[in-house]
Amino acid sequence: MNPVLFLAAALAGGVGAVLRYLVDLGVARLAGRRFPWGILLVNLSGSFVLGVVTTALPDAAFLLGAGLLGGYTTFSTAMLDTVALWRDGERPASVFNAVGMLLLGLLAAGLGLAVGALL
């Protein structure tokens, strides 16, 4: 792999992580912290954009997909939030966070692939 591309992807991952933090913080300010709406939005939007990038910009898929979107999206935080909801007695919210994020993420990725194919 080209070392410059590798470095650019690493830097893009850092940018993605900062964007994730800002989106999560902004959504939490609007919606509160009872449910992790910010992380849900991050993962769904990231799934959609990755679908678009994969089909419409295949040459940029590593930089944008593994780099920017790899830093932006987060499975680990989503699962930690799911466990925290369960622990706090928010069983329906916990199940929705796990199952809903998976199903909605698949839908978002599929829509992204379809949109990317049209571009």
Where are these regions (language model features)?
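Membrane-interface helix-loop junctions in multi-pass transporters/channels
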Residues: 1-119
